[in-house]
């Protein structure tokens, strides 16, 4: 039998470029003109794909084997890459192909880009994304917030206007039931609050805890917002459906802000309102050791003699919870109160 004729290794063609994305490039090499593979793998031609390092201008191997296709992954968008094919014969002889240059594509617009534009207050990018029609305007981020919620919370009034003009739903809620109006009220962004109200946001919406926008505004402590809300028709003694607390009760429990309490009381808030457990704002302020608020509530007519549904009054609460300053204040106030004449 005649020995197999050894075909000299010719310089291969550069890899053929297949599918290109923003993070991958497909390369394959044409073997149609070569003899069909026969015998054990060690007698086949071996292929290597090498990628150029643009800084060092040398090449590194990113694939080696007997396949005729390779997908290069983990690439950067809109970046030029240079590759060459190395073909090695069983005898160790090798040849390099000419270099092929390929650029990855632009990264497709996603909801992440959309939310990133809102987060950093990038008006131009937001407009480009919306004009391109690549994303739904109400798509939530990973925390369940729509773009409008984020813009409202951060006080980005221009972005709020852009999003509303592009059809966003002002009454959508996040996972805890808060809408954009509640978030803007809590953060104190009056311009955003006014604009949301103008475009259909409701004072009557409640979160999962039963709180309204005024409850959240009271927590936030921004008096200009609270003042405008009340003038716009907010019910000053609106009760949450969880604890039965009014905004004044929230102040007594959370911040102890005298300014917010004064504003609510001046607007007609009931200083002796009771929650589901029979507690008054004064009792809650005592329990939370808000000394100055206790003083204010007493000055505004809070009744220090009432008991909750368990028969406990503010003096007993102050003693049990060791609220010494508040206790002194209450006892001093009690001394000054006129004694009631006994009725026979």
UniProtKB/Swiss-Prot annotation:
Q: List this protein's GO terms for biological process.
A: negative regulation of apoptotic process; positive regulation of apoptotic process; positive regulation of DNA-binding transcription factor activity; positive regulation of DNA-templated transcription
Q: How does it assemble?
A: Interacts with COPS5; regulates the phosphorylation of JUN and the transcriptional activity of AP-1. Interacts with RYBP; may prevent the ubiquitin-mediated proteasomal degradation of FANK1.
Phylogenetic lineage:
Eukaryota, Metazoa, Chordata, Craniata, Vertebrata
What PTMs does it carry?
A: Polyubiquitinated. Polyubiquitination leads to proteasomal degradation.
Tell me the protein's name: Fibronectin type 3 and ankyrin repeat domains 1 protein
In this chain the Fibronectin type-III domain maps to 11-108
Listed under GO cellular component are: chromatin; ciliary basal body; ciliary base; cilium; cytoplasm; cytosol; nucleus
Q: Which Pfam families match?
A: Ank_2 (PF12796)
Annotated PROSITE patterns? ANK_REP_REGION, ANK_REPEAT, FN3
Q: Which organism is it from?
A: Rattus norvegicus
Q: Where are the ANK repeats?
A: 109-139, 143-172, 176-205, 209-238, 243-273, 277-306
Q: Which InterPro entries match?
A: Ankyrin_rpt, Ankyrin_rpt-contain_sf, FN3_dom, FN3_sf, Ig-like_fold
The organism's superkingdom is given as: Eukaryota
Alphabetized SUPFAM superfamilies for the sequence: Ankyrin repeat (SSF48403), Fibronectin type III (SSF49265)
Q: What does this protein do?
A: Through the activation of JUN and AP-1-mediated transcription, may regulate apoptosis.
**What does the UniProt entry say about where the protein is found?**
Nucleus; Cytoplasm, Cytosol; Cytoplasm, Cytoskeleton, Cilium basal body; Cell projection, Cilium
**Gene3D superfamilies in the record:** Ankyrin repeat-containing domain (1.25.40.20), Immunoglobulins (2.60.40.10)
Gene name on record? Fank1
The family database entries (SMART domains) matched by this protein are listed as: ANK (SM00248)
Q: List the keywords (alphabetical).
A: ANK repeat, Cell projection, Cytoplasm, Cytoskeleton, Nucleus, Repeat, Ubl conjugation
């Amino acid at each position: 039998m005649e020995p197999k004729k050894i075909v000299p290794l010719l310089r291969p063609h550069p890899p053929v470029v297949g599918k290109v994305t923003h993070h991958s490039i497909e390369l394959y090499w044409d073997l149609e003109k070569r003899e069909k593979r026969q015998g054990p793998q060690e007698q086949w031609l071996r292929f290597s794909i090498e990628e150029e390092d643009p800084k060092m201008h040398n090449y590194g191997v990113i694939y080696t084997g007997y396949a005729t296709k390779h997908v290069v992954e983990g690439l950067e968008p809109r970046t030029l890459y240079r590759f060459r094919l190395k073909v090695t014969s069983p005898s160790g002889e090798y040849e390099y192909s000419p270099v092929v240059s390929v650029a990855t594509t632009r990264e497709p617009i996603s909801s992440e880009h959309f939310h990133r534009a809102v987060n950093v207050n990038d008006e131009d990018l937001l407009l480009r994304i919306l004009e391109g029609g690549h994303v739904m305007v109400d798509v939530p981020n990973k925390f369940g917030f729509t773009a409008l919620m984020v813009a409202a919370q951060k006080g980005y009034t221009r972005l709020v206007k852009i999003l509303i003009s592009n059809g966003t739903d002002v009454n959508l809620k996040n996972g805890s039931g808060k809408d954009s109006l509640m978030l803007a009220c809590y953060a104190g962004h009056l311009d955003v609050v006014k604009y949301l109200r103008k475009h259909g946001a409701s004072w009557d919406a409640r979160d999962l805890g039963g709180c309204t926008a005024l409850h959240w505004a009271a927590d936030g402590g921004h008096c200009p917002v609270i003042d405008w809300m009340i003038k716009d028709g907010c019910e000053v003694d609106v009760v949450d459906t969880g604890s039965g607390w009014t905004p004044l009760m929230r102040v007594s429990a959370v911040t102890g802000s005298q300014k917010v309490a004064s504003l609510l009381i001046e607007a007609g808030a009931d200083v002796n309102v009771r929650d589901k457990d029979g507690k008054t704002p004064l009792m809650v302020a005592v329990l939370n050791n808000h000394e100055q608020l206790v003083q204010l509530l007493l000055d505004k007519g809070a009744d220090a003699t009432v008991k909750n549904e368990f028969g406990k009054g503010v003096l007993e609460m102050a003693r049990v919870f060791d609220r010494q300053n508040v206790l002194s204040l209450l006892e001093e106030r009690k001394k000054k109160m006129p004694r009631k004449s006994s009725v026979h």
